[in-house]
Amino acid sequence: MEEFQVYLELARSRQYDFLYPLIFREYIYALAYDHGFNNSILVENLGYDNKSSLLIIKRLITRMYQQNHLIISANDSNKNPFWGCKKNLYSQLISEGFAVSVEIPFSLQLISSLEGAEIVKSYNLRSIHSIFPFFEEKFAYLTYVSDVQIPYPIHLEILVQTXXXXXXXXSCFHLLRLFLYEYWNWNSLITPKKWISTFSKSNPRLFLFLYNFYVCEYESIFLFLRNKSSYLRLTSSGVLFERINFYAKIEYFVEVFDKDFLSTLWFFKDSFIHYGRYQGKSILASKNTPFLMTKWKYYLIHLWQCHFYVWSQPGKIHINQLSEHSFDFLGYFSNVRLNPSVVRSQMLENSFLIENVMKKLDTIIPIIPLIRSLAKAKFCNVLGHPISKPVWADSADFDIIDLFLRRCRNLSHYYNGSSTKKSLYRIKHILRLSCIKTLARKHKSTVRVFLKSLGSELLEEFFTEEKEILSLIFPRASSTLQRLYRGRIWYLDIFYFHQ
């Protein structure tokens, strides 16, 4: 590990042509497979010693470059000792180390940018719940929203060129091109969408790197125009298109925007476009008319088609009013509703009522998809009626209760930001009764007899846990405690959302 740190320090002062030699370093594969330096995945699977591991990688790369090894029949795989685990073991072995190698320059860029901007590293900013206070503050004053599903890149060469434009390591990205095209040859009979799904499962680290970089490239262009939209009318298209970092090497993209986009730049003068994204889904919201949102929609479609060669139909991007439609984001249904309030005022002997209407962002738990997920996990049926969990019935009573409580705690932790708690109580009730039925099944008893023998206070933790946590935060403020428990709470320690 010390050798790896020294190598990273040397790389800070160099160009990014150091990536290709990293593929031949043993500790890269130790990092990739979470093994020690004396216990590499190459040594375990292929039976070679540490001294010859460098030679193994060289041989694998050489064989990958040979045309006759890119297409190998099933009979040949039986004769080849390298094909003992998977049919594409060549690329599988090297792609793991390659994924670690290509992450290095971008990690260095992130560290240097944080140091240069003197940004304090805060884990709270990483929480996906931190976006909801932003929605509460901004979306109450907005009128239109559009949820956009970022399409997957289909053309392999676009992925390679996009990644190569940021890191100048030609040899390394020639190898990346070989990985992708070899994998495409092995799965040429399936659809592009299915190919992406298969590739993401077989090479998750490399897929995440490529997809994140693809989204970053998309957002860099999109957010650049968003930030510059207030003075786009004053900026000539010639200066705008000279930014090679944002518009990478596709002449058709420049030609289309040079001819057709000049007449539409005027419509992008808007300082109230708000953007949020998690994984592949993004949200656009605006205060102005739907005409502006339509312009942004067609801009995104042209951006995907001309820059990434991805076809997207305009009908898949919907523009809705926040007051009439909900948008699905991060497991919540959110919309803006009117919250009327009446204030009584008295001046001397005259009193009158003042009706005040305020907009409020509502976050609602999608109860039907949640019940469907619980039914898939065998906690209830499709109607939401709790059932026992036979798989856990062989465990100890304490372990069974802990398993149910853990899932209840996670759901409660995430969905405490809901405007109403009725749906959350229903989910807790399903898990509570499922736990009781599982315990009764284990003891070969009925639910009624089991509860009668142990008392009605069993499993009260399902409903009292949040109150106990808040009582520790506000030990003396009972009114504040009750108000917070009835209201929504956003936790800043949630870093991912598993759909």
From Swiss-Prot:
What keywords are assigned to this protein?
Chloroplast, mRNA processing, Plastid, RNA-binding, tRNA processing
Annotated GO biological processes are: mRNA processing; RNA splicing; tRNA processing
Query: What does this protein do, in the record's words?
Result: Usually encoded in the trnK tRNA gene intron. Probably assists in splicing its own and other chloroplast group II introns.
UniProt cross-references to PANTHER family, sorted A to Z: MATURASE K
As one GO molecular function, the record gives: RNA binding
The name this protein carries in UniProt is Maturase K
What domain of life? Eukaryota
Q: Which residues form the signal peptide?
A: none
Q: Which residues cross the membrane?
A: none
Q: Where, subcellularly, is it found?
A: Plastid, Chloroplast
Q: What Pfam family is a match for this entry?
A: Intron_maturas2
| Xref: HAMAP family | MatK
UniProt lists the family membership as follows: Belongs to the intron maturase 2 family. MatK subfamily.
Q: Which InterPro entries match?
A: Domain_X, Maturase_MatK, Maturase_MatK_N
Where is it mostly found? Answer: plastid
Identify the species of origin: Chamaecrista fasciculata
State a GO cellular component annotated for this protein.
chloroplast
